[in-house]
Amino acid sequence: MISISDSAQAHFVKLLADQPAGTHIRVFVISPGTSQAECGVSYCPPDAVESDDVELEFNGFNAMVDAKSVAYLEDASIDFVTDQLGSQLTLKAPNAKMRKVSGDAPLVERIEYVIQSEINPQLASHGGNIMLVEVTDDGVAVLQFGGGCNGCSQVDITLKDGIEKQLLDLFTGELTGVRDVTDHQPGAHSYT
């Protein structure tokens, strides 16, 4: 479910050494399954352990996960990285905003999962996003751009060289193309 690197495990052991006996760490997702999902790690004293928590055992400590966060922390990883700028704990949870879908799920659900877990996080760096409007009977994914992508001068390149290529590679034989139906209105919101 959650992988924790050796360096992160050592970091947690060091932090927990200064806490009361029996304190664990808690890994959680606030607003799981939504675009506002936020992941975090905190101390979990013994009296904060719930009966339905999932307990994960690591070397020198245990990690507690509340029942509603479990599915959204599938394939999550925690690392502790040190570089010239200092040290940083990173938590990556690709399924926090949307549950991972099975390979035999309907095409619309699988496309939506890729959009939410892979494409929109990339577009977010420019303040943008896309939404799947529909998949036509002839296999065209109809998309609508929002945020900084609406009116962006590079939207055609993003669509054809990025999004379409990625989706066609992932859904070969099921998807035949993508089409943008956004009424692009360049403005202060547009990424330039």
Swiss-Prot record:
One of its GO terms (biological process) is protein maturation. Its cofactor is [4Fe-4S] cluster. It comes from the Bacteria. Transmembrane segments: none annotated. SUPFAM superfamilies: Fe-S cluster assembly (FSCA) domain-like, HesB-like domain. Keywords: 4Fe-4S, Iron, Iron-sulfur, Metal-binding. [4Fe-4S] cluster binds at C149, C152. Gene3D superfamilies: Fe-S cluster assembly (FSCA), HesB-like domain. One of its GO terms (molecular function) is 4 iron, 4 sulfur cluster binding. Binds 1 [4Fe-4S] cluster per subunit. The cluster is presumably bound at the interface of two monomers. The keyword Thylakoid does not apply. Belongs to the NfuA family. Homodimer. Involved in iron-sulfur cluster biogenesis. Binds a 4Fe-4S cluster, can transfer this cluster to apoproteins, and thereby intervenes in the maturation of Fe/S proteins. Could also act as a scaffold/chaperone for damaged Fe/S proteins. This is Fe/S biogenesis protein NfuA. The gene is nfuA.
